[in-house]
């Protein structure tokens, strides 16, 4: 028995066969393919498209933000376009019949709207600060927080489409762009390689020790240098005024120090021995010829004045030596006094043997030195005496109207700043000799030896 033939089914099969036969030509003609449309558009210049019904006509495309309503009816006529409705857009020139729908930022993907949708631009979605876009497909992405790189350092900071690149510290390994402790590493070969102790860590303690020791060594060196300087200043006190003048640019005030074993005081009539031409005269003590000692007896009245005018007549006194009982007779040839003649001493020799102090109570002595030194050589004279340049200029400005008073102030300042055993006429004489001013030295000597000066001035010893 055969299957019954249904007339309706047979008709359907015949129609299907006819459609398959005409598909390559008829269907293609009814619905033009995309390639054919592009070929026809290429026949027109840029910014225009071919009329869908008449290829010889090129119509102007619609601007972005608009869509095509009707094609141009003939060459030279404009295409009819309208602006896209709200929620739709076209981002470029087109001849589409309908605008595209705007996309919406997906909150479930933690997206945020960067800029809203406009007629000529689609909605722009992005991520919040400290987040990056992790794409799940070509168009869909999810916002993920950037890695803070705990237990590591940031190699590359977080960007819009890239997470932070971290470099983990020793004892941690990178897992999912996070630094995980090596204690969580079990049997992962990659993990075990990353958790090996680096060789460079062995030298780190040495580097840190050097960083600590270097400042300590510098500090101890400075302390040692300071201690040495203090010790030298204590060992050599004469350096203190010079160091003071170098640091402060001024002369240090020097206290008047009496020389060891030397007491200088003004001469008085009671303390000045008298002089006599008698060769047997004893200026200090008179001794009897008996073996026993007797009280000293003055033989002549004492001269009331002793000044530079008497220096050329100065003769050392002669003493009588009386042997004591039981003394060796070889030491004493005669009991009679034997005078010892002495040569006449020069003024310079007397000054060198007995340095004379420049006394401020006697301004005439200072003025004698001021008037004896040429003004053109005065600054050189004071520099050689040891007065600082700053002090010289200060006193010169202070007494600018009177040059003589300025020179007197400089000499007085030198006398006050110089120790007592150094501020002597001997020092002044040596400086003048070094300056080849022996004539000036003689003038000063004559001034000090003059009767007018001797009658009012007593040089201290």
Curated annotation (Swiss-Prot):
It comes from the Eukaryota. Disulfide bonds join 44-58, 59-72, 62-81, 84-99, 102-117, 105-125, 127-143, 146-158, 149-166, 168-179, 182-195, 185-191. Pfam families: Death (PF00531), TNFR_c6 (PF00020). GO terms for cellular component: axon; cell surface; extracellular space; Golgi membrane; membrane raft; plasma membrane; protein-containing complex; receptor complex. Residues 363-448 form the Death domain. SMART domains: DEATH, TNFR. GO terms for biological process: aortic valve development; cell surface receptor signaling pathway; cell surface receptor signaling pathway via JAK-STAT; cellular response to estradiol stimulus; cellular response to mechanical stimulus; cytokine-mediated signaling pathway; defense response; defense response to bacterium. The keyword Acetylation does not apply. It is a single-pass type I membrane protein. Residues 1-29 form the signal peptide. Receptor for TNFSF2/TNF-alpha and homotrimeric TNFSF1/lymphotoxin-alpha. The adapter molecule FADD recruits caspase-8 to the activated receptor. The resulting death-inducing signaling complex (DISC) performs caspase-8 proteolytic activation which initiates the subsequent cascade of caspases (aspartate-specific cysteine proteases) mediating apoptosis. Binding of TNF to the extracellular domain leads to homotrimerization. The aggregated death domains provide a novel molecular interface that interacts specifically with the death domain of TRADD. Various TRADD-interacting proteins such as TRAFS, RIPK1 and possibly FADD, are recruited to the complex by their association with TRADD. This complex activates at least two distinct signaling cascades, apoptosis and NF-kappa-B signaling. Interacts with BAG4, BABAM2, FEM1B, GRB2, SQSTM1 and TRPC4AP. Interacts with DAB2IP. Interacts directly with NOL3 (via CARD domain); inhibits TNF-signaling pathway. This is Tumor necrosis factor receptor superfamily member 1A. It comes from Rattus norvegicus (Rat). The lineage of its organism: Eukaryota, Metazoa, Chordata, Craniata, Vertebrata. The gene is Tnfrsf1a.
């Amino acid at each position: 028995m055969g299957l019954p033939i249904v007339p309706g089914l047979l008709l359907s099969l015949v129609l299907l066969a006819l459609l398959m036969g005409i598909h390559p030509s008829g269907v293609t003609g009814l619905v033009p393919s995309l390639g054919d449309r592009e070929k026809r558009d290429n026949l027109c210049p840029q910014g225009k498209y071919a009329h869908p019904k008449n290829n010889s006509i090129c119509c102007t495309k619609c601007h972005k933000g608009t869509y095509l309503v009707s094609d141009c009816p003939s060459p030279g006529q404009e295409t009819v376009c309208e602006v896209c409705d709200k929620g739709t857009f076209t981002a470029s020139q087109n001849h589409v019949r309908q605008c595209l729908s705007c996309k919406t930022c997906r909150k479930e993907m933690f997206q945020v709207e960067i800029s809203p949708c406009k007629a000529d631009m689609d909605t722009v979605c992005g991520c919040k600060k400290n987040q990056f876009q992790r794409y799940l497909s070509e168009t869909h992405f999810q916002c993920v927080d950037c890695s803070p790189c705990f237990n590591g350092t940031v190699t590359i900071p977080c960007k819009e489409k890239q997470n932070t690149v971290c470099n983990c510290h020793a004892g941690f390994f990178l897992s999912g762009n996070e630094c995980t402790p090596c204690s969580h590493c079990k049997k992962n070969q990659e993990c075990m390689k990353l958790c090996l102790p680096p060789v460079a860590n062995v030298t780190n303690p040495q580097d840190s020790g050097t960083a600590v020791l270097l400042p300590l060594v510098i500090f101890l060196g400075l302390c040692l240098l300071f201690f040495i300087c203090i010790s030298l200043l204590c060992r050599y006190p004469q350096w203190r005024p010079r160091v003071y003048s170098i640091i402060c640019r001024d002369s240090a005030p020097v206290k008047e120090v009496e020389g060891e074993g030397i007491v200088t005081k003004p001469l008085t009539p009671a303390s000045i021995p008298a002089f006599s031409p008698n060769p047997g005269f004893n200026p200090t003590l008179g001794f009897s010829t008996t073996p026993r000692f007797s009280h000293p007896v003055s033989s002549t009245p004492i001269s009331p004045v002793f000044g530079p005018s008497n220096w050329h007549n100065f003769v050392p006194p002669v003493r009588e030596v009386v042997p004591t009982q039981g003394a060796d007779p070889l030491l004493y040839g005669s009991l009679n006094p034997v005078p010892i003649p002495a040569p006449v001493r020069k003024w310079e020799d007397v000054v060198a043997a007995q340095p004379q102090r420049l006394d401020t109570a006697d301004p005439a002595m200072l003025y004698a030195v001021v008037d004896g030194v040429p003004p053109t050589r005065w600054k050189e004279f004071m520099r050689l005496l040891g007065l600082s340049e700053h002090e010289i200029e200060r006193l010169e400005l202070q007494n600018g109207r009177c040059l003589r008073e300025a020179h007197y102030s400089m000499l007085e300042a030198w006398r006050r700043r110089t120790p007592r055993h150094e501020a002597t006429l001997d020092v002044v004489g040596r400086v003048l000799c070094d300056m080849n001013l022996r004539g000036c030295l003689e003038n000063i000597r004559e001034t000090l030896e003059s009767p007018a000066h001797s009658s009012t001035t007593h040089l201290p010893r």
